[in-house]
């Protein structure tokens, strides 16, 4: 039976470039979608740029252009990058669209009518010059505890104390430099706590399509933490409003109030699909009505599970729509075992990869070969990337066609022999459903291992039958024809198995094979007495120099981007000079993160269990806003001040040092990287 499926990837934010971390998710999604289409299902893949919020508004102001102009330009760049990697969206839209405005307002009205919206008066700091309320990270001032200057509105980077912006001494706006005022403002809250019973049932439930869980096991465990046990819930109501000026959609009947970006961003899935439906004549309501029998899957990063597994299903359900069939999260991408680094050139943008002339299908294959159905981080090891692509794709796969096609063209007028009874091909067709199940369940790594095992069998058959020797022997034409026809058929089957991962190679192979297109049926059916075309080379080897040039290009692009910022004086002024003796008092050491977790009762602190080599310590750091998924820091090397006096962190415990981080221009805190080879306890200086 033909399935009706809607699939989405998380929406990239419209203020930065697409990098390989983004590509992990979009490759994972695209492979699954292409597999469904190969099987003949009606599968629609929709995405969009996430365009609203303060960062976009301020970025456009810095460029001196309207936000609408900036997001239009960014969308073109994003779509070009994704298209370059053969991501086959059926629609790539924008959250700044009439459809999204209508859906956001309709959902809000439905939630309000259902008693799930409440207004409350809150206090916030206000910039009188810019006439805007200021988020925590847009307020700076003097730390109320250690009196360090120029500290952010949520925590002190010198002593680690956390506080509210209203506690800062002599606060000023990071946007205009003026002194902010404390003002009251009416905000609107989605009463998420009242949705707990539904969410407990949905998060622990199974979808009606195949009985599989809505969430992965790791995600479900996290939801249980957030939802609480029994009748109690730890869910907080969600502030869904922001004050003008704000780039976004105005809340109905609330002039000057705008939807927070995380309300209208997931609604963007609906808007993109509605835009597609109107163009191709699909019934939108069939997919989103409360009793829909269609399927809807969201592929996301593990850092946004909270929004997609709690807010989004609750918003949909209590506004009269269906909830997702499944939400599938993936881990983060590291490069050579470490977080992507701009200084090392491993923060690789999609654009730089394409501009350096690397084949995007090399990366599609390598990423897919690392992915499974679990929420696990994956590592791009650049040496392994070179060897795996060259060995698997060039050495094992395309080489099969190259070794057989010439004989078919020269000796048999380009026509195959009927080899339907081939034992070799029977081995390949026998794996069709098993490999299909691997794709279906997102076990891509296993699927590709099994496919390469079949390629090994085919290559063993080549070596055992030696068509190049058969071609020299009298009376062996029929056997040569049979062997080469088996090899071309085997190549066709392998191409069909690999088509979700290598769509462009599959399309080029279809031309060579004289087929309209490769489908999943090609994993089972032989070609018969079929005429093929002249073989054209399908894939080149990866060269070490190409990878070296890619890394160097990313280093240079970062340096070039940093230069104007320095010239324009965008960095904070350098603090007053310190003597050498002052510096030598600070004992900075490398430490390994054994465990990092959120601190119950604090929205700002993370608790680090650290190994300093010579001893283990606990340090609290106010960087929770920058690392919403603290477990991702486990195993990472950090730099910490080892001789900082222990300090009591309110009710949370004693912090035995201070972890160093950098404050970025967008108000985030980023931990400092430690280069390869450094060990816990090593002195920094």
From Swiss-Prot:
Its main location: cytoplasm. Homodimer. Its EC number is 6.1.1.10. Binds 1 zinc ion per subunit. CDD domains: Anticodon_Ia_Met (cd07957), MetRS_core (cd00814), tRNA_bind_EcMetRS_like (cd02800). Zn(2+) binds at residues 143, 146, 156, 159. The lineage of its organism: Bacteria, Pseudomonadati, Pseudomonadota, Betaproteobacteria, Neisseriales. A motif ('HIGH' region) lies at residues 12-22. Its cofactor is Zn(2+). A motif ('KMSKS' region) lies at residues 339-343. Belongs to the class-I aminoacyl-tRNA synthetase family. MetG type 1 subfamily. GO terms for molecular function: ATP binding; metal ion binding; methionine-tRNA ligase activity; tRNA binding. This is Methionine--tRNA ligase.
């Amino acid at each position: 039976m033909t399935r009706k499926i809607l699939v989405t990837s998380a929406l990239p934010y419209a203020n930065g470039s697409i990098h390989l971390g983004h590509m992990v998710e979009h490759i994972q999604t695209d492979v699954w979608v292409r597999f469904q289409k190969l099987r003949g299902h009606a599968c629609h893949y929709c995405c969009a740029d996430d365009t609203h919020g303060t960062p976009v508004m301020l970025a456009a102001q810095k460029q001196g252009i309207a936000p609408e102009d900036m997001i239009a330009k960014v969308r073109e760049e994003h779509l070009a990058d994704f298209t370059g990697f053969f991501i086959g969206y059926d629609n790539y839209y924008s959250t700044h669209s009439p459809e999204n405005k209508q859906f956001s307002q309709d959902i809000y009205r439905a939630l309000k009518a259902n008693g799930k919206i409440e207004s409350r008066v809150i206090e916030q700091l206000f910039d009188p010059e810019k006439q805007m309320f200021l988020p925590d990270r847009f307020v700076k001032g003097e730390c109320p505890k250690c009196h360090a200057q120029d500290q952010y509105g949520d925590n002190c980077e010198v002593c680690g104390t956390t506080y509210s912006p209203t506690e800062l001494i002599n606060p000023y706006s990071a946007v205009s430099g003026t002194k902010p005022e404390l003002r009251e403002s009416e905000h609107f809250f989605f009463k998420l706590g009242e949705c707990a019973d539904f969410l407990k049932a949905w998060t622990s439930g199974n979808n009606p399509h195949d009985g599989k869980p809505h969430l992965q096991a790791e995600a479900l465990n996290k939801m249980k933490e957030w939802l609480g046990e029994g009748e109690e819930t730890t869910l907080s109501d969600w502030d869904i409003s922001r004050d003008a000026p704000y780039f976004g959609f105005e809340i109905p009947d609330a002039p000057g109030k705008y939807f927070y970006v995380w309300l209208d961003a997931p609604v963007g899935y609906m808007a993109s699909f509605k835009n597609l439906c109107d163009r191709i004549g699909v019934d939108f309501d069939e997919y989103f009505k409360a009793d829909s029998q269609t399927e809807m899957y969201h592929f996301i990063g593990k850092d946004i599970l909270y929004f997609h597994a709690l807010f989004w299903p609750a918003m949909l359900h209590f506004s009269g729509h269906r909830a997702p069939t499944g939400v599938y999260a993936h881990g983060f991408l590291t490069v050579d075992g470490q977080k992507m680094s701009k200084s090392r050139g491993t923060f690789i943008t999609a654009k730089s990869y394409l501009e350096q002339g690397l084949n995007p299908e090399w990366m599609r294959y390598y990423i897919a070969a690392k992915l499974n159905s679990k929420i696990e981080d994956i590592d791009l090891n650049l040496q392994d990337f070179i060897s795996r692509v060259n060995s698997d794709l060039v050495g094992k796969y395309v080489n099969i066609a190259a070794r057989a096609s010439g004989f078919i063209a020269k000796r048999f007028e380009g026509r195959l022999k009927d080899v339907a009874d081939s034992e070799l091909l029977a081995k390949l067709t026998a794996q069709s459903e098993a490999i299909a199940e691997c794709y279906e369940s997102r076990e891509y790594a296993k699927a590709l291992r099994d496919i390469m095992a079949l390629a090994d069998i085919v290559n063993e058959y080549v070596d055992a039958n030696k068509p190049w020797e058969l071609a020299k022997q009298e009376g062996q034409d029929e056997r040569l024809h049979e062997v080469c026809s088996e090899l071309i058929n085997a190549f066709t089957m392998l191409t069909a198995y690999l088509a979700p991962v290598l769509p462009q190679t599959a399309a080029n192979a279809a031309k060579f094979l004289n087929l309209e297109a490769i489908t999943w049926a090609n994993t089972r059916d032989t070609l018969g007495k079929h005429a093929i075309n002249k073989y054209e080379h399908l894939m080149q080897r990866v060269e070490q120099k190409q990878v070296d040039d890619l890394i160097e290009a990313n280093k240079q692009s970062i340096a070039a981007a940093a230069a104007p910022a320095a010239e324009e004086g965008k960095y904070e002024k350098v603090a007053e000079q310190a003597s050498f003796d002052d510096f030598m008092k600070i004992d900075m050491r490398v430490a390994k993160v054994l465990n990092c977790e959120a601190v119950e009762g604090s929205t700002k602190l993370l608790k680090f269990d650290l190994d300093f080599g010579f001893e283990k310590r606990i340090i609290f750091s106010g960087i929770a806003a920058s690392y919403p998924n603290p477990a991702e820091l486990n195993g990472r090397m950090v730099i910490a001040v080892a001789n900082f006096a222990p300090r009591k962190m309110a009710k949370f415990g004693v912090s035995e040092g201070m972890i160093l981080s950098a404050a970025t221009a967008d108000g985030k805190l980023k931990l400092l990287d430690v280069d390869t080879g450094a060990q816990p306890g090593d002195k920094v200086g």
